[in-house]
A protein has these predicted regions:
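Cys/His-rich microdomains that often coordinate metals
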Residues: 1, 19-22
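Short, intrinsically disordered, charge-biased short linear motifs at domain edges
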Residues: 1-6, 330-333
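Short metal-coordination and nucleic-acid-contact micro-motifs, chiefly zinc-binding Cys/His arrays
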Residues: 6-9, 341
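Short cysteine-rich clusters marking metal-coordination/redox-active sites
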Residues: 13-16
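A contiguous, basic/glycine-rich beta-loop/short-helix subdomain that forms a polymer-engagement track
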Residues: 22-144
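C-terminal nuclease/phosphodiesterase catalytic domains that cleave nucleic-acid phosphodiester bonds
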Residues: 26-27, 91, 218-386, 392
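Nucleic-acid-processing active sites and adjacent nucleic-acid-binding tracks
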Residues: 92-140, 147-212, 389-397
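Short His-Asn-centered micro-motif
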Residues: 145-147, 211-219, 241-242
Length: 397
């Protein structure tokens, strides 16, 4: 119940159904009887499950527990399972089964892949970098790039993925590539120009180009410098990004002006802006998006480029508990040895989409984009007929 803006709660007697106020809790607990309801699996050893409602702690006031449950339930409906997981673990004393885990598994996502048996009919190595068959629902294209290694380390490369976006942030995976070479080498980074120069042709003939792309600037000074220098001459498309591991950080922070050489002096006037991508928020957002199973707003389509390996990398993270000063919190962690390049690239591509949205009036962006293309914004029905054959990928460099 809610009274005068505050939660009140009572216990309902299982026999007479009459309400018992919280003020009677101590009286109830002192007169309770513990009765076994199951046969002991180990002879002579019994146990009882007692949850927080029996506690005398002020924090276990029934009204507080009701409020916490309602808040956790509301968060769960919005795609955030952490409050409910905490409530189930610490208040009810029960285990937590993440209902989203099955939805985001590689096997389940592979079932959504459209016409994979048709093969990869396109190559980004074509002379004019033209790719056809992009669904009509796509109004905007962004990219995310992850840096792997550098400075002569093993398996050094760039990993890039491209997503198309439409009304309601419905998304289509359009391309995924491994670009061999040292990410600290400007010649390796220059391979990204191929993606920026690509003409993405929709089924209705409308031509799109990459609107924005986020490049992970890596973890060392040399990689940061290389990425920032690359972006400084391509600021209309590429921006450097970096993960923000602290909880509570927004999915995409405000741009922070940074130097792009070791002398702390910008090579070009105003330098470049670095954007921090909130790790917790972006992973949580991706989990929610992958859990959307109805085509339309928020749904993510997978095409020919969405290989089994990419889908395995798309969401390897699991929510793991950590205890600090007696409090339990949950953090996203990938199992040891698990690859997450596909997920990182997708998080950066989605952050690039959020960067683009800052240019537009809220609620009118998709209509404005459609008008700029000379078309009408389609409904959220999957992007038009024949949109089942799309996407490209591979390795180059």
């Amino acid at each position: 119940m809610i009274k005068e803006g505050k939660f009140t709660a009572h216990y309902e007697c299982e026999n007479c159904k009459k309400p018992i106020p919280h003020s009677k809790k101590r009286w109830m607990v002192e007169r309770c009887e513990d009765r076994p309801t199951a046969v002991a699996q180990v002879p002579g050893l019994i146990g009882f499950h007692v949850w927080a409602a029996y506690s005398y702690s002020p924090a276990a006031d029934w009204s507080i527990l009701v409020r916490e449950y309602k808040e956790a339930l509301e968060a769960l409906r919005k795609g955030d399972p952490e409050p409910m997981q905490t409530f189930r673990n610490t208040v009810l004393g029960e285990g937590w089964e993440d209902s989203q885990a099955g939805k985001v598994s590689a096997d389940n996502l592979a079932k959504r892949r459209q016409s994979a048996e048709l093969g990869n009919g396109y190559s980004i190595l074509g002379e004019d970098f033209t790719l056809t068959g992009v669904p009509n629902g796509v109004l905007l294209i962004t990219a995310g790039v992850d840096t792997q290694g550098g400075g002569g380390t093993a398996n050094e490369r760039l990993v890039a993925t491209v997503w198309g976006w439409g009304v309601g942030e419905e998304g289509w995976h359009l391309g995924h590539w491994d670009i061999d070479g040292d990410p600290q080498d400007k010649n390796t980074l220059a391979q990204l120009d191929r993606i920026a120069e690509t003409k993405w042709v929709r089924e209705d003939g409308t031509v799109l180009r990459l609107a924005r792309g986020g490049i992970d600037e890596g973890g060392d000074a040399t990689s940061c410098q290389a990425v920032r220098e690359f972006c400084s001459t391509r600021k209309d498309v590429w921006v450097p990004v970096r993960g923000a591991p602290q909880k509570g950080k927004p999915l995409l922070g405000r741009g922070v002006p940074v130097s792009i050489n070791r002398k702390n002096k910008p090579i070009v006037k105003n330098g470049v802006n670095l954007y921090f991508v909130g790790y917790d928020e972006s992973v949580k957002s991706l989990q929610y998006r992958l859990g959307v199973e109805t085509v339309g707003s928020g749904y993510l389509h997978f095409g020919l480029c969405s290989t089994d390996q990419f889908l395995a990398e798309l969401f390897p993270w699991r929510r793991m508990p950590r205890r600090s000063r007696g409090q339990i919190s949950y953090h996203w962690e990938a199992p040891t040895g698990a690859r997450d390049e596909g997920g990182d690239c997708t998080r950066y591509a989605y952050a690039a989409l959020q960067l683009v949205t800052r240019r537009y009036t809220p609620g009118t962006m998709w209509a404005q984009l459609a008008r700029s293309l000379g078309t009408q914004a389609p409904g959220t029905g999957g992007g038009g007929g024949g949109a089942n054959r799309f996407g490209t990928g591979g390795r180059f460099g």
